[in-house]
Amino acid sequence: MISSLGAQAYFTSIFPQNPGFRSARTMSLGMSGVATSAGIENVWTNPALLSTNEKRLSITAIGSLRRFEEKRAFPVMDMFDDVVTNNVYVANRYWYNNMEGGMVLKLRKNNYLGLSKSTFWDFTYDYAEEVRGSLPSGTYNRDPVRGYNEIHRGGQITAYSIGMSQTVFSKINIGYTANILKGETMVDRYAINVLEPDDALASDSSYTFSSYVSLAGTTMMPTFGISYQPNRQYQIGFAYQKGIDLSFNNVWTIPKINERTQLPGFHHPSVWDSTGQVTIALPAKMSIGVEAKMKNPLKTKAVFELHYTDWSKYKLTTGSTLDTSQSEMNFSFKEAWEIHSGIEHYFQEQIPFRFGFIFSESPLGQEFEHIQITLGSAYVWGKATFDFGIIFGSLSYRYEDIFPAMADETIDLETVNESSSNVKFSIQYDF
């Protein structure tokens, strides 16, 4: 169910933003893994393909560094009400890091066990806006700083996974993974800092609200996988990840539907209520893929995958821990397909070049469809394999001002431009 949404970061507490557990190798191959025997990440993508390449034990550590940039701009009109340009009034750039890893153990012939710790849902989103006033001509400083608007969301839901694979026939493998989901240090902060009252601010006085959101209990999410290898050249994989319900307590920022855009939005109550609760039902995800070993003089592999999620089954309900009544948000999300493809070409025996791309539909509509490009390589040194991968993409959409000025009624929607890149390094050691 984790999709390569990869953007729309403002909606990070409504949609899972992490594209799932991937090593640098599978990330550089277009976030593949359904039909490719790649190691520990098969615990997540397709447990039927768990393998240690005939080694007894493989241990993998994965580090990532993600850069995110968001620019918001409002349209500038001429006397004929035509848009002359879009004036960028806030630009946020942040770097985030993460660590994941696990191991694959060969129990006996054609039977493998995988253990991993990975990020299931990353809630991180940071927004900082400097608000300036507008004074008449002749004033030395015509645009003094009047205040700041801030949003900070942090924390994640971590997946502790255990998976197994077994060969049932000579060409068919089956696998199962139990993903135990646990929330870790989730925070939600919303602030308006007023240095001096001004109509350009969203409030005439400062206020800050912070809540430490908790995931109610632990949730188990199963993944089922099957693979079929008709010959040495082709391998076909299928995976199914079951839908789950997640309940969050101590919620202050309440999701809602933005009336103008019909996109997700947020309501920030003026009074703190520690009994707020949000329950999100995430739909199941189905994936199918094929890996082909090309008949080239140099070793070459190609992968192609389709992923399907029926986001119309997504549900979000709000309520209180003090009573059983709940209110359901009807977001009217749409089903979405993803296409993942990649090529691994060895120029030298141990040094590959990898390239891939991802096309993702969005449950939010055509405006949010986007393409991501991936690149990578690797080097083998003895029993250790060092992999490097990078993924990058961008997105543009229209939305309201999230901190509207008190004096102005915003008529035109703003343009939000997002760009992101993620660099991953993997080290795998075989015993």
Model-derived segments and spans:
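Outer-membrane beta-barrel porins/channels
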Residues: 8-28, 96-431
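Sec-dependent N-terminal signal peptides
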Residues: 1-3
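N-terminal, post-signal peptide beta-strand-biased segments of exported outer-membrane/organellar beta-barrel
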Residues: 5-121
